[in-house]
């Protein structure tokens, strides 16, 4: 059986002497793994098509065993991102999020499209913290983990909302907050940003001005929310934190 699909390359790893095992996020087939044979050979025509976070059109041979990539055409290499260490690190973080959160064989077309959108903006416009926060929230929404912000998830009250409960996935009112575990306090600005991320287009999100305090609070909240519901730790978050601390301030 033969298959052709547009795909975002999540990662690749050594597989036998001259092959690589490639993990990809396909437009209609979802996440899958396939072998790229002879990819380590200097003249391999597939080499550029299966690099992490590139966008390619791939041809597969599917059988009872492992899927094989037989041909490929590079659609976008995101060269500006690859030439910039910081941007590359963030692009790889997006791929780590996909790899650790997606089940194989489950198509999520909207997430596929938004991933391409974020990679394109990162490549052409440079790094913007809200770009990454947009992707994190978009991932959660597409996986069915949208945070509930407009009412208390325990009693339904819509006013006097006090804290966000990670185990309950939403806000708690003052009365219910006393029995909460894993609660996170969020400012009004941060709550507004979370709501904006969940319902707005990327172009709108990128134009929003955010205070440093709310930016840090938003990043912390989404990090803990992702870790709680995806039950994963994301290694590149630590690397990015180290990078931020080491960068000069002017």
Curated annotation (Swiss-Prot):
- InterPro entries on file: ARFGAP/RecO, DNA_rep/recomb_RecO_N, NA-bd_OB-fold, RecO, RecO_C
Asked if the Swiss-Prot or TrEMBL record annotates the protein with the keyword DNA repair, the reply is yes
Q: Which domain of life is it from?
A: Bacteria
Where in the sequence is the signal peptide annotated?
Answer: none
Which keywords, in A-to-Z order, does the entry hold? DNA damage, DNA recombination, DNA repair
Of the GO CC terms on this record, one is:
bacterial nucleoid
A Gene Ontology biological process in which this protein takes part is: double-strand break repair
Q: Which residues form a coiled coil?
A: none
Q: Which NCBIfam families match?
A: reco
PANTHER family linked to this entry: DNA REPAIR PROTEIN RECO
According to its UniProt entry, the function of this protein is described as:
Involved in DNA repair and RecF pathway recombination.
Q: Which HAMAP family match?
A: RecO
What family name appears in the similarity comment? Belongs to the RecO family.
Q: What is this protein called?
A: DNA repair protein RecO
Species whose genome carries this gene? Syntrophomonas wolfei subsp. wolfei (strain DSM 2245B / Goettingen)
């Amino acid at each position: 059986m033969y298959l052709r699909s547009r795909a975002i390359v999540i990662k690749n790893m050594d597989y036998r002497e001259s092959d690589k095992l490639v993990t990809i996020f396909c437009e209609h087939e979802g996440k899958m793994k396939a072998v790229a044979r002879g990819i380590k050979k200097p003249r391999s025509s597939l080499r550029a098509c299966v690099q992490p976070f590139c966008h390619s059109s791939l041809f597969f041979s599917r059988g009872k065993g492992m899927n094989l990539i037989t041909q490929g055409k590079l659609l976008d290499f995101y060269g500006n991102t690859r030439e910039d260490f910081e941007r590359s690190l963030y692009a790889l973080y997006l791929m780590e999020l996909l790899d650790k959160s997606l089940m194989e064989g489950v198509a999520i077309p909207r997430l596929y499209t938004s991933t391409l959108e974020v990679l394109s903006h990162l490549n052409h416009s440079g790094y913007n913290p809200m770009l990454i926060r947009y992707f994190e929230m978009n991932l959660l929404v597409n996986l069915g983990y949208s945070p509930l912000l407009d009412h208390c998830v325990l009693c339904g009250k819509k006013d006097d909302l006090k804290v966000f409960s990670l185990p309950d996935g939403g806000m708690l009112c003052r009365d219910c907050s006393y029995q909460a575990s894993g609660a996170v306090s969020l400012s009004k600005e941060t709550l507004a940003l979370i709501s904006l991320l969940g319902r707005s287009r990327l172009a709108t999100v990128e134009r929003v001005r955010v205070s440093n305090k709310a930016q840090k609070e938003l990043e912390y909240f989404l990090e803990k929310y992702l870790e709680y519901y995806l039950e994963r730790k994301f290694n590149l978050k630590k690397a990015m934190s180290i990078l931020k601390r080491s960068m000069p301030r002017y």
